[in-house]
Amino acid sequence: AARLIGDVPGLTLTLDYTHFTKIGLPDGEIEPLVQHASHFHVRGGRKGRLQERFSHNTIDYQRVAKVMQKTGYRGWLGIEYVWIDWEHCNECDNLSETVLYRDFLRGLTL
């Protein structure tokens, strides 16, 4: 992704850690992409699960927020829970999970 961004002037990413986490990529390997992002998706995820409950999430969003601050991230952030019969995305209460992440993000101290 970083190479493609370098080849296309003005191209930015919508960054969603859950897609990388699902395939087992650690947060530290995803972080270099933050500097190229203009939109960011937040939801719970873990290895093998594209979408997960807040209580089972393995993404360190406190760490991610610090990387965003360090790189001067100024883009949008959206809490993205979806309800579809695919990739276990119909096993969470989307509204409750969205509220949990909203409150978590509001409480972050950087």
Pin down the residues of each PLM region.
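Histidine-acidic metal/acid-base catalytic patches
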Residues: A1-T14, T21-L110
